[in-house]
């Protein structure tokens, strides 16, 4: 029993030992050990001249490009640029770096890249770029046995993107990344997208706050300069702006403020303070929205789509304020002459009101009338020459002081006394009617202006919105 258990334990212990012995033997015979790799790398770098391109004097070097887009951090309309973070990989074949005896790829320290020839690639529309350096410089160099070199970088670049903002914010923009050789012409180097359509990855995973990436396109071409023809690769992003932010921040507030300005049509026309305050407030609010929007956009010479909408809202708000100015002009007077005449009438009325309380009595107790008072009590062609009833009680008054809202009882008694003695009262009634006709405006016209405005403004503003959105959306 013990012997069987001992043998089983021995067998279990001997298996790992045998595996370790096999592994050690294999490791000792493995050519890819540290010393052999070190010798291989030293041999490759010994006598290597980074000043000369691969196959110098022969055919051009084919450099393949691959891009893995990590993020598009910002798209700025003010600066006309966008910021892109990517993993940028270049690959080419350098026969001077081929090796044998090691069936493995050699991934070396990033500092080895400073000892090897690399393409003089640059971004044509670059404004500011940098290679990330945390915690070490984000570079990769990998050698293949056939001499293929893979060179990778993690780069953040801010590239120029010229935008057409005529349809802003209902626009689509094309932002490109131009990759070109700075010094080598097509006689020395050629660029191509390594992997065809799969050369660019990660685009579908990108999410932007104000844009959606509709499509992207890769282009390979040659450009001619005075110094020769140079290879160029272009990666173009088609960005469609999301309208949701602008509806909440610009379109909806502007629409509500325009509708708010129409409230004045339902306010009584003699409430000047309320209607003027409402009109001025809405005008200033629209001005503030327009000013804030201009600060977030470049100073461009053409009119944008959002400018047209804001100007339309501003016109409707301003016309609502002018509508009350027109109503006020009709209701309270037709020009400065009317205002001057009303002031003179007011001062004359005050003077005559004071004189109405004065009564002149002769020695017999009769009330006397002055020449002006006699003229005021007669019609155009009829002249009062005397008073038939010396006991009649008369008060001096002026026709200019007739108040149609608060008639004096003493004047009515005096009028009846004159009518009783044969002095006609129809002329006086006609004078009062003519004065009432001049002083009281036609309230029906004022009400009709507000009434028609309540229908005209909403209908025209709705038509403006229909035309605007149909034109710019489709």
Curated annotation (Swiss-Prot):
The chain crosses the membrane at residues 246-267, 271-293, 305-327, 452-473. Histamine binds at residues 122, 181-182, 227. The keyword Zinc-finger does not apply. Residues 1-25 form the signal peptide. Keywords: Cell membrane, Chloride, Chloride channel, Disulfide bond, Glycoprotein, Ion channel, Ion transport, Ligand-gated ion channel, Membrane, Postsynaptic cell membrane, Receptor, Signal, Synapse, Transmembrane, Transmembrane helix, Transport. It is a multi-pass membrane protein. It comes from the Eukaryota. Potentiated by histamine. GO terms for cellular component: chloride channel complex; dendrite; GABA-A receptor complex; GABA-ergic synapse; nuclear envelope; plasma membrane; postsynaptic specialization membrane; presynaptic active zone membrane. 4-aminobutanoate binds at residues 182, 227. Beta subunit of the heteropentameric ligand-gated chloride channel gated by gamma-aminobutyric acid (GABA), a major inhibitory neurotransmitter in the brain. GABA-gated chloride channels, also named GABA(A) receptors (GABAAR), consist of five subunits arranged around a central pore and contain GABA active binding site(s) located at the alpha and beta subunit interface(s). When activated by GABA, GABAARs selectively allow the flow of chloride anions across the cell membrane down their electrochemical gradient. GABAARs subunits share a common topological structure: a peptide sequence made up of a long extracellular N-terminal, four transmembrane domains, intracellular or cytoplasmic domain located between the third and the fourth transmembrane domains. PANTHER family: NEUROTRANSMITTER GATED ION CHANNEL (PTHR18945). Belongs to the ligand-gated ion channel (TC 1.A.9) family. Gamma-aminobutyric acid receptor (TC 1.A.9.5) subfamily. GABRB1 sub-subfamily. This is Gamma-aminobutyric acid receptor subunit beta-1. The lineage of its organism: Eukaryota, Metazoa, Chordata, Craniata, Vertebrata.
């Amino acid at each position: 029993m013990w012997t069987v258990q001992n043998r089983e334990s021995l067998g279990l212990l001997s298996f790992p030992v045998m595996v370790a012995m096999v592994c050690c033997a294999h490791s000792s015979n493995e050519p890819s050990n540290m010393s052999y790799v070190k010798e291989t790398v030293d041999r490759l770098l010994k006598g290597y001249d980074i000043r000369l391109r691969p196959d110098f004097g022969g055919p051009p070097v084919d450099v393949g490009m691959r891009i893995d887009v990590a993020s598009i951090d910002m798209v700025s309309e003010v600066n006309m640029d966008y910021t892109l973070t990517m993993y940028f990989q270049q690959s080419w074949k350098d026969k001077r770096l081929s090796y044998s005896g090691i069936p493995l790829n050699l991934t070396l320290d990033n500092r080895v890249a400073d000892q090897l020839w690399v393409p003089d690639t640059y971004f044509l529309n670059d404004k500011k770029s940098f290679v990330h350096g945390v915690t070490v410089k984000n570079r990769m160099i990998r050698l293949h046995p056939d001499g293929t070199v893979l060179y990778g970088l993690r780069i953040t670049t801010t590239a120029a993107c010229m935008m057409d903002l005529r349809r802003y914010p209902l626009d689509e923009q094309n932002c490109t990344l131009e990759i070109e050789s700075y010094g080598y012409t097509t006689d020395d180097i050629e660029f191509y997208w390594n992997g065809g359509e799969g050369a660019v990855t990660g685009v579908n995973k990108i999410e932007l706050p104000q844009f959606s990436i509709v499509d992207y396109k890769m282009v390979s071409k040659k450009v001619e300069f005075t110094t020769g023809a140079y290879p160029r690769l272009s990666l173009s992003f088609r960005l469609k702006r999301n309208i949701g932010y602008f509806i909440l921040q610009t379109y909806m507030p502007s629409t509500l403020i325009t509708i708010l300005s129409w409230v004045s049509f339902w306010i009584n026309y003699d409430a000047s303070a309320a209607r003027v305050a409402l009109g001025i407030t809405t005008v200033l609010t629209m001005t503030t929205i327009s000013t804030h929007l201009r600060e977030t956009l470049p100073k461009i010479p053409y009119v944008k789509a959002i400018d047209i909408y804001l100007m339309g809202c501003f016109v409707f708000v301003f016309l609502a304020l002018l509508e009350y100015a027109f109503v006020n002009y009709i209701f309270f007077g037709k020009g400065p002459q009317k205002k001057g005449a009303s002031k003179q009438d007011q001062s004359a009325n005050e003077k005559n009101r004071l004189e109405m309380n004065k009564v002149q009595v002769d020695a017999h107790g009769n009330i006397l009338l002055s020449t002006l008072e006699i003229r005021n009590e007669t019609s155009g062609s009829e002249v009062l020459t005397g008073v038939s009833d010396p006991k009649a009680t008369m008060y001096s008054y002026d026709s200019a002081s007739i108040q149609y809202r608060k008639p004096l009882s003493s004047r009515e008694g005096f009028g009846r006394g004159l009518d009783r003695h044969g002095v006609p009262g129809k002329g006086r009634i006609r004078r009062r009617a003519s004065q009432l006709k001049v002083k009281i405006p036609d309230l029906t016209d004022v009400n009709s202006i507000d009434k028609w405005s309540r229908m005209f403004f909403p209908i025209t503003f709705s038509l403006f919105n229909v035309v605007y959105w149909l034109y710019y959306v489709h």
